[in-house]
Amino acid sequence: MALNLRKTHPLLKIVNDSLIDLPTPSNISAWWNFGSLLGICLITQIITGLLLAMHYTADTSLAFTSVAHMCRNVQFGWLIRHLHANGASFFFICIYLHIGRGFYYGSYLNKETWNIGVILLLTLMATAFVGYVLPWGQMSFWGATVITNLFSAIPYVGQTLVEWLWGGFSVDNPTLTPLFALHFLLPFVIAGLTLVHLTFLHETGSNNPLGIPSDCDKIPFQPYYSIKDLLGFVLMLTPLIAMALFAPNFLGDPENFTPANPLVTPPHIKPEWYFLFAYAILRSIPNKLGGVLALAASVLVLFLIPLLHITKQRSMTFRPLSQMLFWTLVADLLILTWVGSQPVEHPFIIIGQLASLAYFTIILVLFPIVSALENKMLNL
């Protein structure tokens, strides 16, 4: 009898091995849903982004007007725009939860998968930043000015680099056009990296909440986890659509309703909420170069996590001390996010500095110490 086409066809075989007959641990929890949710976020963002790009004009004199035109005159343009803007927020919620799950359950020991994942995060952050500039509102313009200007802190080449990025002596048309090109290109880079991420993941197979090998207890992905993922899609897309319909500007900045004006600086320049933790770390160091290095370190520190793993157990499931430290880190990140949205004045300055210090101390110092202590207590 002829074998199933999905098992023999060169292309369908790849799909089959990734989504249908994939052997999956039988005990992975809802925390493992965020990978597929990120995939749905990416597809949603590419589709809505493509529809927006058809009506957008990458020119300083027309960008703001073209976005307004989209919301007023294009069929469901307002909905597409708000799905795209809020979709970015959901993308970051999912990626932060996905990283948190990887950190908690020791998934970072699949080093290639983890490192590609960190590169994916950096690419996503770059994409979101350049996308935020495109509507050419006040916060778009000044956000672009402030963040690109950070490159001037690089010794010797900094100022030249900034002028090259700007295409002149300030953020203007030669800055906007390349940023639009980048914003169009980067999601496809993310899609390519996602395939690499999955390729490395399928080399080792998924981790599980116990952090032990699950080769003896695997079940096929279809139908068990495909239906579970479907539930995840519904639970994510429902609040996204509700937000786009009922509170589309809840996470946006009111300054962006004003067209960009180089002569008027907004009272508080701040990025979107998903960058606030890094922005707070940047602001907590009074020196410009030091701040830029701390900003970079706040994300690049993720590359070090596999090297700092000294515990004999993979997962934190049975390590209460590490669990306490993990949730302290989560609370610290929430404090940083809140501080980043506040003006630079007392007491927010000192709170931000203490929270930034705590962030690096927990990851680089306390986790290894506590891991060694747990090894000792358990005689491992």
UniProtKB/Swiss-Prot annotation:
GO terms for biological process: mitochondrial electron transport, ubiquinol to cytochrome c. Its main location: mitochondrion. This is Cytochrome b. The chain crosses the membrane at residues 34-54, 78-99, 114-134, 179-199, 227-247, 289-309, 321-341, 348-368. The cytochrome bc1 complex contains 11 subunits: 3 respiratory subunits (MT-CYB, CYC1 and UQCRFS1), 2 core proteins (UQCRC1 and UQCRC2) and 6 low-molecular weight proteins (UQCRH/QCR6, UQCRB/QCR7, UQCRQ/QCR8, UQCR10/QCR9, UQCR11/QCR10 and a cleavage product of UQCRFS1). This cytochrome bc1 complex then forms a dimer. Keywords: Electron transport, Heme, Iron, Membrane, Metal-binding, Mitochondrion, Mitochondrion inner membrane, Respiratory chain, Transmembrane, Transmembrane helix, Transport, Ubiquinone. It is found in: Mitochondrion inner membrane. Heme b b562 binds at residues 84, 183. GO terms for cellular component: mitochondrial inner membrane; respiratory chain complex III. Component of the ubiquinol-cytochrome c reductase complex (complex III or cytochrome b-c1 complex) that is part of the mitochondrial respiratory chain. The b-c1 complex mediates electron transfer from ubiquinol to cytochrome c. Contributes to the generation of a proton gradient across the mitochondrial membrane that is then used for ATP synthesis. Its cofactor is heme b. One of its GO terms (molecular function) is ubiquinol-cytochrome-c reductase activity. Heme 1 (or BL or b562) is low-potential and absorbs at about 562 nm, and heme 2 (or BH or b566) is high-potential and absorbs at about 566 nm. Belongs to the cytochrome b family. It is a multi-pass membrane protein. The gene is MT-CYB. Binds 2 heme b groups non-covalently. InterPro entries: Cyt_b/b6_C, Cyt_b/b6_C_sf, Cyt_b/b6_N, Cytb/b6-like_sf, Cytochrome_b, Cytochrome_b_C_euk/bac, Cytochrome_b_N_euk/bac, Di-haem_cyt_TM. The keyword Ribosomal protein does not apply. It comes from Aphelocoma coerulescens. Heme b b566 binds at residues 98, 197.
